[in-house]
UniProtKB/Swiss-Prot annotation:
GO terms for biological process: translation. PANTHER family: 60S RIBOSOMAL PROTEIN L23A. Keywords: Ribonucleoprotein, Ribosomal protein, RNA-binding, rRNA-binding. Part of the 50S ribosomal subunit. Contacts protein L29, and trigger factor when it is bound to the ribosome. Signal peptide: none annotated. The keyword rRNA-binding applies. One of the early assembly proteins it binds 23S rRNA. One of the proteins that surrounds the polypeptide exit tunnel on the outside of the ribosome. Forms the main docking site for trigger factor binding to the ribosome. It comes from Carboxydothermus hydrogenoformans (strain ATCC BAA-161 / DSM 6008 / Z-2901). One of its GO terms (molecular function) is structural constituent of ribosome. Belongs to the universal ribosomal protein uL23 family. It comes from the Bacteria. The gene is rplW. Pfam families: Ribosomal_L23. This is Large ribosomal subunit protein uL23. The keyword Ubl conjugation does not apply.
Length: 95
């Protein structure tokens, strides 16, 4: 089994994710190879909360140019985690 800290890379704090936090849904950037069950277990172990549902999205890298050089931003996977009513992740509070 993978270490939960290897699965959950970092929280994704944007205006849209803060609106979702009001609905008890929290957004994280996760390992590209992690599945929903691994993400659920990692969140429950790290934050001591109960997860009801996990939605995942693979975000493609965007094309970027610097002068004549063309490259891409990295691809990543994000997970939107819905918690049981009454549970909170304090990391997102007060941002």
């Amino acid at each position: 089994m993978k270490n939960p800290r290897d699965i959950i890379i970092r929280p994704l704090i944007t205006e849209k994710s803060m609106d979702l936090a009001q609905e008890n849904k929290y957004t994280f950037i996760v390992d590209k190879n992690a599945n929903k069950i691994e993400i659920k277990n990692a969140i429950e172990e790290l934050f001591k909360v109960k997860v009801e549902k996990v939605n995942t999205i693979r975000v493609k890298g965007k094309m970027k140019r610097v002068g004549r050089f063309v490259g891409r931003t990295p691809e990543y996977k994000k997970a939107i985690v819905k918690l049981r009513a009454g549970d909170k992740i304090e990391l997102f509070e007060g941002v």
